[in-house]
UniProtKB/Swiss-Prot annotation:
Name used for this protein in its record: Voltage-gated hydrogen channel 1
Complex formation: Homodimer.
Example GO BP: cellular response to pH
Membrane topology: Multi-pass membrane protein
Lineage: Eukaryota, Metazoa, Chordata, Tunicata, Ascidiacea
InterPro entries given in the database record: Hvcn1 (IPR031846), Ion_trans_dom (IPR005821), Volt_channel_dom_sf (IPR027359)
Species annotation: Ciona intestinalis
Biased composition (Polar residues): 86-102
Length: 342
């Protein structure tokens, strides 16, 4: 028994000082995985947790789990021989950390051998899944604001408006339908189906970008109109003819408002893209003007240098070699300026 205990104690001590294995336990649980790197990462040296005096070489990042820090670093060569263990204290190093509630990032301080700690707290503890969700939301937002979706929504809104007008004309006896004809029920069913699509659209908008949806009153009003229209269509199934007539009139107004609202939204979107394009062109034009100004200064400096060199040649009675006339450079500069203005 004593021999087994001695071997276990030596094995534990070997793990603490082994350059390929280190264990540091934390007094408080952490909400996510924390990646630690050594203070001497840039020079390829990592300090042993059980001793601050003898640095050990390591090139791998240190990995911190929720309840304990298990650091496993492997050499590039698997056949590399491990150095002999040294006799040191087996007492684990205790690190006390306090989580900050003001931000989603944990600020590390006074960690001794560690230079920094960096991790992101996800809702479910999985950062990769959160990044995937954000990417899917961006894709969904791009799809919902694309031109084909806008056109499809306008077509559905106009079709829904015609269906509601048809129901209204049938209820007003403008269009006489024989008793027992299923035409009113068919029109109402199509209208309810289109409203269901609009309800799904509103839900997808909230999922894609709820902040944008909440901060834009027009989007909220549009959602209210869709919900009211859907509720009224459901209520029409259970009410009498007189109440249905008044409700259908309200539905017509709401449908027409949606048509104008969506058309206006498309116009604003196109105008915004055009303004962005104009701003980009102006920015490039400013950069070209600055580049032209710099080239003008360089050209002026070169001309001054050439004049001084010519003067030196004249003083030494040296023939000046033929050069390109100055008017040529001026003509090139004028052409460049004209093309930039266009």
């Amino acid at each position: 028994m004593e021999g087994d205990n001695c071997n276990k104690s030596r094995h534990k001590s070997h793990n603490m000082i082994n350059p390929n294995y280190a264990s540091v336990r934390c007094t408080q649980p952490l909400p996510s995985v924390i990646q630690l790197r050594s203070r001497n990462k840039m020079i390829g040296i990592t300090e042993d947790p059980s001793s601050d005096s003898e640095p050990v070489s390591s090139n791998q990042p240190l990995l911190l789990t929720n309840l304990s820090y298990e650091v496993h670093t492997f050499n590039d060569n698997n056949n590399h021989e491990r150095p002999a263990p040294q006799e040191q204290s087996t007492q684990n190093t205790m690190i006390s950390m306090q989580s900050e509630q003001k931000s989603d990032r944990f600020t590390a301080s006074n960690l001794g051998m560690f230079q920094y700690m960096k991790f992101e707290i996800g809702e479910d503890g999985d950062d990769h899944e959160e990044e995937a969700i954000l990417t899917n939301r961006e894709k969904l937002r791009h799809i919902l604001h694309s031109k084909p979706i806008h056109v499809a929504i306008i077509v559905l809104v106009v079709l829904d408006s015609f269906l509601v007008v048809g129901e209204l004309l049938i209820d007003l006896k403008v269009i006489i339908v024989p008793h027992g004809n299923p035409a009113p029920e068919i029109l109402h069913g199509f209208s309810l189906s289109i409203l269901s699509i609009f309800m799904v659209e509103i839900a997808l908008k909230i999922i894609a970008d709820h902040r944008h949806f909440i901060h834009h009153k027009v989007e909220v009003l549009d959602a209210v109109v869709v919900v009211i229209s859907f509720g009224v269509d459901i209520a029409l199934i259970f009410v009498g003819e007189s109440e249905a007539l008044a409700a259908i009139g309200l539905l017509v107004i709401l449908r027409l408002w949606r048509v104008f609202r969506i058309i206006n939204g498309i116009i604003v979107t196109v105008k915004t893209k055009a303004d962005d394009r104009v701003h980009e062109i102006k920015k490039k034009n400013s950069e070209l003007e600055l580049q032209i100004h710099n080239l003008e200064e360089k050209l002026s400096q070169k001309e001054q240098d050439m004049s001084r060199l010519h003067e030196i040649l004249r003083c030494n009675n040296i023939d000046i070699p033929p050069t390109v006339p100055l008017t040529t450079s001026v003509q090139i500069h004028s052409t460049t300026t004209a093309s930039a203005d266009v």
